[in-house]
């Protein structure tokens, strides 16, 4: 799957006569970074605008067993001490175009009402919030976890559609479940999770914007300036995404577009969808590895007590349930992936059809110009490519006839009425 992703974007790096085909006016730049050295010093602030079409869902696991749970023989139980098994739950998300975005950076979020807040996670763990003008937002509550670590902020800087204060949180937990009025940023996987009320507001208003920083690009990553509005944090240059059609004059007052831009053929989310598939597969493999670990521990002497064996047996039972859920989710991911891949294939087919249409127009223009050239060549031949002696003879003959006609006419005019009376 990873090779498929690499191969897909590599096609966007093709060049003709030393100029890259899919990068608009920047024909000297490839679509992807060709090496880690090329990507080393790249640092962009990227702005992505979303509509309801970008909303998707993901499956998270509840009561799932971690490696620490296994090593500590921690069996999942409810408040009454009853063993509970892993389960799944669906959460709403907006998937960013990139994973591994900068965690200690600024996330500028604009909701459907135009409310803008810049949430900065500082290196010391604190979180600061500023408005669109850069002023500190008042009335913000800082949230912490059980260990006192800051997890997010709550305030009235966004709309959830019902007037409630919205919480913006940061997490690295891939199984995090947001509250109804919560926006959760997972910079590691490049996701913005939306609580139920926030999701409904985004879906109804059809508008949401996220601005984020990314500085850890690597070989094979797509250049963001080809897809989004960006600011180069190294040079300060601002890139505004717009159509960069290269046109040639092929006839009088007739131009033809000769290039295809990357976003017209190569969907940047192809790679993210591949990431979802690999994640689903890896999750199954990880659970199988955990099950093998538990089975191995059950054979060890130090876990031979009845209590330890009971705990390991309960954990193994939970992992078995977790494995069934993971395999089911993997199947659904691949079923969904088939439809997504068909959509990407259709996008490429449409781009190819557009190129074919332009080739047809060019051929028609060429045929028409060739016909016009033939007609003008024929006319030129009829007017210029003739026998000079024959022309002189014809001209002299015509001149004699003309002069004779003039002479006869003059004699008739010289006669008067008196010449006929007598």
Regions found by a protein language model. Give the residues of each.
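Amphipathic alpha-helical coiled-coil/heptad-repeat segments
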Residues: 1-124, 132, 193-195, 218-271, ...
């Amino acid at each position: 799957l990873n090779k498929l992703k690499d191969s897909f974007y590599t096609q966007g790096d093709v060049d003709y006569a030393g100029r890259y085909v899919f990068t608009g006016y920047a024909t000297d730049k490839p679509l992807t970074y060709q090496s880690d050295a090329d990507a080393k010093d790249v640092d962009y602030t990227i702005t992505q605008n979303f509509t309801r079409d970008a909303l998707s869902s993901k499956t998270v696991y509840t009561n799932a067993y971690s490696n620490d749970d296994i090593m500590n023989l921690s069996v999942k139980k409810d408040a009454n001490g009853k063993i509970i098994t892993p389960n799944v739950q669906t959460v709403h998300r907006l998937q960013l175009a990139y994973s591994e975005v900068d965690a200690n950076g600024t996330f500028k979020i604009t909701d459907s009402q135009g409310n803008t807040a810049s949430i900065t996670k500082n290196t010391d763990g604190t979180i600061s919030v500023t408005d669109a003008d850069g002023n500190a937002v008042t009335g913000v509550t800082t949230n912490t976890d059980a260990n006192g670590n800051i997890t997010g902020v709550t305030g009235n800087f966004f709309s959830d559609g019902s007037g409630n204060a919205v919480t913006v949180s940061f997490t690295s937990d891939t199984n995090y479940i947001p509250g109804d009025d919560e926006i959760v940023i997972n910079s590691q996987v490049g996701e913005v999770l939306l609580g139920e009320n926030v999701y409904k507001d985004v879906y109804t208003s059809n508008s949401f914007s996220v601005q984020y920083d990314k500085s850890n690009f690597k070989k094979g990553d797509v250049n963001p300036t080809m897809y989004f509005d960006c600011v180069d944090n190294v040079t300060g240059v601002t890139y505004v995404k717009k159509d960069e059609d290269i046109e040639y004059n092929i006839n009088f007052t007739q131009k033809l577009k000769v290039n295809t831009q990357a976003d017209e053929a190569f969907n940047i989310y192809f790679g993210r969808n591949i990431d979802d598939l690999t994640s689903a597969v890896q999750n199954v493999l990880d659970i199988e590895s955990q099950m093998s670990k538990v089975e191995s521990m059950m054979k060890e002497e130090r876990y031979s007590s009845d209590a330890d064996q009971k705990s390991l047996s309960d954990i193994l039972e939970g992992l078995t349930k977790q494995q069934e859920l993971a395999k089911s989710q993997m199947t659904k991911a691949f079923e969904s992936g088939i439809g997504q891949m068909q959509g990407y294939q259709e996008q490429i087919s449409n781009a190819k059809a557009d190129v074919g249409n332009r080739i047809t127009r060019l051929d028609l223009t060429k045929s028409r110009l060739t016909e016009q050239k033939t007609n003008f060549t024929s006319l030129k031949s009829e007017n210029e490519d003739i026998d000079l002696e024959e022309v002189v003879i014809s001209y002299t003959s015509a001149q004699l006839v003309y002069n004779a006609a003039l002479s006869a006419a003059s004699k008739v005019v010289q006669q008067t009425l008196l010449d006929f009376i007598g």
